[in-house]
Amino acid sequence: MSVRGYSGVQVISSRKHRSMSRLPTVLLLLASAAVLAAGGQEATEDPFADETDQCQISVSAETMKSLHGGSMQPDGTCDNLWESFLSQFHQVRENLTACQERAAAGPAPDPSSQFCQQLLDDAQRQMEQEHRQYAATLEEQLHAAQQETQQEQEMKKALQKQLDALTDSRNALYIDLLLANIAIGETKQALSYYNLMPASMPIDKLHEQIVRFVYRVTIYQDQRLLNLMRFVRDIPSVEERRSLYQLAQREVQKRPSQRDGYVAAVYALSVREDLPVYQANRQLYDDLVRQSETRLKEQVANGNFKQAAELAARQPQHFRQLQTSLATIELKHWRKFDRFVPYANALPQPAQRLEVLRVLLSQIGDREKKTSHKYLVKAARQFDICEQFIGRGKVDQAVKKQLEELRGKFATFAKGKNYQHYLSESRKSSG
């Protein structure tokens, strides 16, 4: 069925278009028609304007009925029908707009959901509060633990400091006892304290301290050095012995009183007796021994017996290694015989004196066979002094036997002249 157009728009309802029955499509068409109608009304206001193009929309009767909820009258006028369409369209549009806004704003909360949400929020707040309280408690406990740990660390440091101080005091005491025993010659006791030194203590520093102590007091330095030599021999470590020997040698070389005296000889002979140390650098110690021996021989030849006598008294074992050499007068000093001959009785022990007399008589026989008289007279005088010295003490049979052998030696130089002859001559010359 065809209906007259409204404002340039025709709406045609025909049964042969029943296939177009979906509401969204019709609404779209109606919206388009409304726009076109508005434009058409504006155009018709001008009486001289050409007639606008008409838009024809075909709507089935079933669709029209569905739009009106089945209440549409088929015989209604087109204007009424169109007004009804527009009214319903606007209503639907408003409903759709409101629905869209509600959808965008979110669904309305359900009262039961609101209650559950409140419970959930309360539980969340309570959990957060408990969490804050628990975190605060843990923070306090952690702070207390840190303070306790710091206090314990401070106590530990204080105890360690006290322990270190006690250890230092103990080590200082050991060193003092070590040095004191070296000073008095108690080498075994000194070695026991030496072995108590901690491994953490640098051994070279300890050795330097020992040697400095030896030379701390000048009047005691010779005896302390001799004690040190005896102490060093008992140290098990070859390297430690070598270290102490080298430090001592430097000090000996600095001091003429030791370098030119018997102390240097004792030092060098001590090192030579220590084979592991001596073999490491023999030339160094051999040179020192020769230098010391040469100086002592020069002193004895010039009538200076002090150093040789001290060596014989303080280090008889070391003196024994040099006594024959010291008793032998070099040819260039033979003319100083008068100065040299009293050397025999400058020595402290009978065996040492007899050895000098033996070497002296042997040299007279080798050098002055034909002109021995004046030398034997002087030798007889020293023999008499030696015999009196031996008679005042207790001596073994070996010394007495050697004394008689030397007495008989005087008779071998000239026929009919014995010891008594030369002794009488010496008493005459001395007046």
Swiss-Prot record:
Glycosylation, residue list = N95
**Signals that turn on the gene:** Induced by blood feeding (at protein level).
Give the protein name, as stated in the record: Saglin
What is the predominant subcellular site recorded for this chain? secreted
Q: What happens when the gene is disrupted?
A: (Microbial infection) RNAi-mediated knockdown results in fewer Plasmodium falciparum sporozoites invading mosquito salivary gland.
Q: Where would one find coiled-coil regions in this protein?
A: 120-169
Q: What does this protein do?
A: (Microbial infection) Facilitates invasion of mosquito salivary glands by Plasmodium yoelii sporozoites.
From the UniProt annotation, give the residues forming the signal peptide. Answer: 1-39
Further comment: Monoclonal antibodies against saglin/SG1f fed during blood meal inhibit Plasmodium yoelii sporozoite invasion of mosquito salivary glands. Monoclonal antibodies against saglin/SG1f fed during blood meal inhibit Plasmodium falciparum sporozoite invasion of mosquito salivary glands.
Record localization: Secreted
* Source organism of the structure: Anopheles gambiae (African malaria mosquito)
Identify the domain of life.
Eukaryota
Please list the disulfide bridges.
none
Subunit composition? Homodimer; disulfide-linked. (Microbial infection) Interacts with Plasmodium berghei TRAP (via integrin-like A-domain); the interaction probably promotes sporozoite invasion of salivary gland.
List the keywords (alphabetical): Coiled coil, Glycoprotein, Secreted, Signal
Q: Name one GO cellular component term.
A: extracellular region
The entry's note on the tissues where this protein occurs is:
Female saliva (at protein level). Female salivary gland (at protein level).
* This protein's encoding gene: SG1f
